[in-house]
């Protein structure tokens, strides 16, 4: 779900 998040 984000550039620095896995989802």
Curated annotation (Swiss-Prot):
It is found in: Secreted. Its main location: secreted. The modification Phenylalanine amide is found at residue 7. GO terms for biological process: neuropeptide signaling pathway. Keywords: Amidation, Neuropeptide, Secreted. GO terms for cellular component: extracellular region. Belongs to the FARP (FMRFamide related peptide) family. This is FMRFamide-like neuropeptide GGKYMRF-amide. It comes from Hirudo medicinalis.
């Amino acid at each position: 779900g984000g550039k620095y998040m896995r989802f």
